[in-house]
Amino acid sequence: MSKSNESAVAFQTAIASIKLIQASSVLDLTEDDFDFLTRDRVWIATDRSRARRAIEACVYGTLDFVGYPRFPAPVEFISAVIAYYVHPVNIQTACLIMEGAEFTENIVNGVERPVKASELFAFTLLVRAGNKDLIGHAETNIREQLRAQGVM
């Protein structure tokens, strides 16, 4: 598969991930954690563990909710979560915190090649750049879902 085809497949996987995130009504987040994730204040070193927990709650919320074990999420899904939930001021930090994931194609083919934070960041930027319509109203959509669940 050519490099451009690989990129297109990865991008389409990220688009599908965003649609999956939008369809999911299960987030293992409190209102405070959601505000922490989406606010425009820069995360500092002491925020690292809270930031990781909040991002992982978005990635694994449904599995955690029903009590199933977690399995490694692919880069496309993690980048979609970061693009969808994390305020732009913290995207680089989120990518650093979540580095080590692998692309879907590598998981399927049994190839181990964890991505670096810089690669996750670049892919997250591609996801944000190509999906302004899907990402633009994320905070409003999620707040409505949290209110419907009685969390907010």
From Swiss-Prot:
This is External scaffolding protein D. GO terms for cellular component: host cell cytoplasm. InterPro entries: Scaffold_D, Scaffold_D_sf. Assembles the procapsid by joining twelve 12S pre-assembly complex into a T=1 icosahedral particle, called 108S procapsid. Ten proteins D bind each 12S complex, which are formed by three pentamers of F, G, B protein and a H protein. The scaffolding protein is released from the provirion after genome packaging to form the mature virion. Gene3D superfamilies: Scaffold protein D (1.10.1850.10). Belongs to the microvirus D protein family. It is found in: Host cytoplasm. It holds the Pfam family gpD. The keyword Nucleus does not apply. Keywords: Host cytoplasm, Viral capsid assembly, Viral release from host cell. Disulfide bonds: none annotated. One of its GO terms (biological process) is viral procapsid maturation. Component of the procapsid particle composed of 60 copies of the internally located B, 240 copies of the external scaffolding protein D, 60 copies of each of the viral structural proteins F and G, and 12 copies of protein H.
